[in-house]
Amino acid sequence: MKTMVKVRTYILAGAIGIFAFTAFGGSARANPKTGEAEFKEYCSACHFDGGNLINPAKTLSKIDREKNGVKSVKDIIKIMRKPGEGMSMFDEKTLPETDANKIAEYIINTFK
């Protein structure tokens, strides 16, 4: 009898967990993060205020970006996917294309 109660409890707990995961997972997609929020999550530790803790010659300012051949959203995403020495790689599994685009657009529009 006690075993049956435990089994029911585990089944109920699992069902509630699945429901909560799908319910809240769906709401997260309905309210996507902004480029600024994505930047803060993935980039700001090394690129605080558009700087560069690892390589100060490669900040996110327009002047430094252009000096280093980074002129477009596509160029920024290319670096995210295959970065140089000292930068973490953000593949599509880690950072989906839509989020990478938001970050790149945020960089271009924010760091002049």
Task: Show which residues each predicted segment covers.
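Post-cleavage N-terminal segment of exported redox proteins
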Residues: 1-31, 106-112
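Short, conserved catalytic or interaction motifs in soluble domains
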Residues: 26, 48, 92
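Gly/Gly-Pro-rich "capping" loops immediately C-terminal to redox-active cysteine motifs
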Residues: 32, 36, 48-78
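The canonical Cys-X-X-Cys-His
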Residues: 39-49, 103, 107
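Processing junctions and N-termini across compartments
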Residues: 24, 37-40
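Residue-level detector of flexible, active-site-proximal loop/helix-junction positions
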Residues: 25, 67, 94
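Axial heme c-ligation environment in periplasmic c-type cytochrome domains
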Residues: 54-64, 79-112
